[in-house]
């Protein structure tokens, strides 16, 4: 089918990146299981390399299509907006499953857990130490990404650059603190249902922070190369929506698992 028909919609060309992305994701998850059971990270690292290369090349192609070829017309961006909204909704339900598992176990702890929460022998984190600092960091990053967005809409290139830079720095800082918390944790993912739900929920949130930080880094690189304008910057908007979603999920995690659950 011709991609040059007289209509405003973008009929994409054949692309290998969905296939290589699926292979990378499958290899990463398989490697994670192998790492847990056979203590070798080879397959896990290979999967990550494939996934990162796919992300780089897919983002490169989308940037070319939207910025240099002008294929992201107004009707196309409306479709992209709805796609991002539905993706975030699916992510909300993904995290609901973790909260469901947590409350299922914590609201009525069984006799195997000592009929108490946290279970007998589990020393929970102090919610007013690193978790509270992480909360402040993510809330601050929400402010800086909004600052960058408003600056971009007003055509203020330097302030948008500063806002994006500070958001990325705060995202990296959050990830470092989360990794430090995991290293110092007095329990593991194998320590009862508390360890399982804690690491699954906070670990997947940490993964989303990494993805969001990467998303913002791509936007930062595109922004300093003048890919965005006052009226045409959906890539940045999508990253900002995703970052606010990550903020809100962390607030729920902090209130339920760290504060109430401790």
Curated annotation (Swiss-Prot):
> Keywords assigned by UniProt?
Membrane, Mitochondrion, Mitochondrion inner membrane, Translocase, Transmembrane, Transmembrane helix
Source taxonomy lineage?
Eukaryota, Metazoa, Ecdysozoa, Arthropoda, Hexapoda
Q: Which gene encodes it?
A: COIII
Q: What does this protein do?
A: Component of the cytochrome c oxidase, the last enzyme in the mitochondrial electron transport chain which drives oxidative phosphorylation. The respiratory chain contains 3 multisubunit complexes succinate dehydrogenase (complex II, CII), ubiquinol-cytochrome c oxidoreductase (cytochrome b-c1 complex, complex III, CIII) and cytochrome c oxidase (complex IV, CIV), that cooperate to transfer electrons derived from NADH and succinate to molecular oxygen, creating an electrochemical gradient over the inner membrane that drives transmembrane transport and the ATP synthase.
Question: What chemistry does it catalyse, as a reaction equation?
Answer: 4 Fe(II)-[cytochrome c] + O2 + 8 H(+)(in) = 4 Fe(III)-[cytochrome c] + 2 H2O + 4 H(+)(out)
Which EC number(s) does the record attach to this protein?
7.1.1.9
Organism whose genome encodes this protein: Anopheles gambiae
The residues that cross the membrane are: 39-59, 83-103, 120-140, 163-183, 201-221, 240-260
Coiled-coil features, chain-numbered ranges: none
Domain of life, source organism: Eukaryota
The record describes its quaternary structure and partners as: Component of the cytochrome c oxidase (complex IV, CIV), a multisubunit enzyme composed of a catalytic core of 3 subunits and several supernumerary subunits. The complex exists as a monomer or a dimer and forms supercomplexes (SCs) in the inner mitochondrial membrane with ubiquinol-cytochrome c oxidoreductase (cytochrome b-c1 complex, complex III, CIII).
What is its membrane topology?
Multi-pass membrane protein
UniProt similarity note? Belongs to the cytochrome c oxidase subunit 3 family.
Pfam families membership? COX3
Name of the protein this chain belongs to: Cytochrome c oxidase subunit 3
The subcellular localization recorded is: Mitochondrion inner membrane
- GO CC annotation, single: mitochondrion
């Amino acid at each position: 089918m011709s991609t040059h028909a007289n209509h405003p919609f973008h009929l994409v060309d054949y692309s290998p990146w969905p296939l290589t992305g699926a292979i990378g994701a499958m290899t990463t998850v398989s490697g994670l299981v192998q790492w847990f059971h056979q203590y070798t990270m080879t397959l896990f690292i290979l999967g990550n390399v494939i996934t990162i290369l796919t992300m780089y090349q897919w983002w490169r192609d989308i940037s070319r299509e939207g910025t240099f070829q002008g294929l992201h017309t107004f009707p196309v961006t409306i479709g992209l907006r709805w796609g991002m909204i539905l993706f975030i909704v699916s992510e909300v339900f993904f995290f609901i499953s973790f909260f469901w598992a947590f409350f299922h176990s914590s609201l009525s702890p069984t006799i195997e857990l000592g009929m108490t929460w946290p279970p007998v022998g589990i020393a929970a984190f102090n919610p007013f130490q690193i978790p509270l600092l992480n909360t402040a960091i993510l809330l601050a990053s929400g402010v800086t990404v909004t600052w960058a967005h408003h600056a971009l809409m007003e055509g203020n290139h330097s302030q948008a650059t500063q806002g994006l830079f500070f958001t990325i720095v705060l995202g990296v800082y959050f990830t470092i603190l989360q990794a430090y918390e995991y290293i110092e944790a007095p329990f593991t993912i194998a320590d009862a249902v508390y360890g399982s739900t804690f690491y699954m929920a906070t670990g997947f949130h940490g993964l989303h922070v990494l993805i969001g930080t990467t998303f913002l880094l791509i936007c930062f690189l595109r922004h300093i190369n003048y890919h965005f304008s006052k009226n045409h910057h959906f890539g940045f908007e999508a990253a900002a929506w995703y970052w606010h979603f990550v903020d809100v999920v962390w607030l729920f995690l902090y209130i339920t698992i760290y504060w109430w659950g401790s």
